[in-house]
From Swiss-Prot:
GO terms for cellular component: cytosol. InterPro entries: Asp/Orn_carbamoyltranf_P-bd, Asp/Orn_carbamoylTrfase, Asp/Orn_carbamoylTrfase_sf, Asp_carbamoyltransf, Asp_carbamoyltransf_Asp/Orn-bd. It comes from the Bacteria. Gene3D superfamilies: Aspartate/ornithine carbamoyltransferase. Its EC number is 2.1.3.2. The gene is pyrB. This is Aspartate carbamoyltransferase catalytic subunit.
């Protein structure tokens, strides 16, 4: 359990204390990853099924590594090699896999609400690895973990999230978690990519990139979610990059020297980020990737039966 939660589906449901429970445990998990032998027996005898209906590099790989470092058995499932191609429904797929007695199902799906639907039909814990444009809770947690590492705290910090806010599940999870940890969040992007009423979640909205990033402690850059967009919402990627992309010149003129730059990946280089910025000294993008393993270890540990008060196995 994470606090009172059997599942990790939406950070909107998590309290500040429950978010901190995961982040604090992830500190110990990251220490395990620094060892020469990256293996602890914490989840020996447990099993994790990664149920991915969408493509993934970082999330799927890090959940698999997280499970294996904790000594859990990990099964990677792909829709293209399953009975989904024969017409099997999501619920039937999940119930059949759950009949094999896994402890955790990690699911990524193009439909918002898919992980919750699965959770209503299985007895094991369910982790959302991203569902449509709804949420991506583990990404929100690892972004906050990275910011705590780099900034010390999120309390009172200003975070700018720039890009396709309307179609980004990362933006929503980041917004929920960051505001609960005391950050001031600015959202920025084309007006056609800012959802109406988003200010009700505690953010302020800027349509000009400079207004959003000047004075910020961190900037989270997001790609355009082409796979979720029907009719074009922007004139083109060149125009988008000119107005909302971050290049070396803009970064030098507008960003504080100590400002850090995040991106959940994959990066569309030359669109939302220039290569010089993505690979530059202010970028913490690879730190995010590394921290993703530690945070997902913490999530699996807590949901598969670990107790944060008895985390000695992970620390031993």
């Amino acid at each position: 359990m994470i606090g009172r939660h059997k599942h990790c589906i939406s950070l909107a449901e998590y309290s500040r204390e429950e978010i901190l429970e995961v982040l604090d445990l992830a500190v110990s998990m990251k220490e395990v990853l620094q060892r020469p032998i990256k293996k602890v027996p914490s989840l020996r005898g447990k099993s994790v099924v990664n149920l991915f209906f969408e493509a993934s590099t970082r999330t799927r790989s890090s959940f698999e590594i997280a499970a294996k470092v904790l000594s859990a058995d990990a099964l990677n499932w792909t829709a293209s090699a399953s009975s989904v191609t024969k017409g099997e429904t999501l619920v039937d797929t999940a119930r059949n896999l759950e009949a094999m007695r896994p402890d955790v199902l990690v699911i990524r799906h193009s439909a918002g609400g898919a992980p919750r639907l699965v959770a209503e039909h299985v007895g094991c814990s369910v982790v959302s690895a991203g569902d449509g444009a709804h949420e991506h809770p583990s990404q929100g947690l690892l972004d906050c973990f990275t910011l705590r590492e780099k900034l010390g705290t999120l309390e009172g910090k200003t975070i700018a999230i720039v890009g396709d806010i309307s179609h980004s599940r990362v933006a929503r999870s980041d917004l929920h978690a960051m505001t609960k940890l005391g950050a001031r969040v600015r959202l920025c992007g084309p007006p056609t990519m800012i959802p109406a009423g988003i200010e009700a979640l505690g953010a302020t909205v800027r349509t000009q990139l400079r207004e959003a990033v000047e004075g910020a402690d961190a900037v989270v850059m997001l790609r355009i979610q082409h796979e979720r967009i029907g009719d074009p919402l922007i004139p083109g990627t060149r125009e988008y990059s000119k107005l909302w992309g971050l290049n070396a010149k803009k970064a030098a003129e507008w960003l504080r020297p100590e400002c850090v730059i995040l991106h959940p990946g994959p990066i569309n280089r030359g669109v939302e980020l220039s290569p010089e910025v993505a690979d530059g000294p202010q970028s913490v993008i690879l730190d995010q990737v590394q921290n993703g393993v530690a945070v997902r270890m913490a999530i699996l540990y807590l949901l598969a039966g670990g107790n944060p008060a008895d985390a000695g196995e992970a620390k031993a």
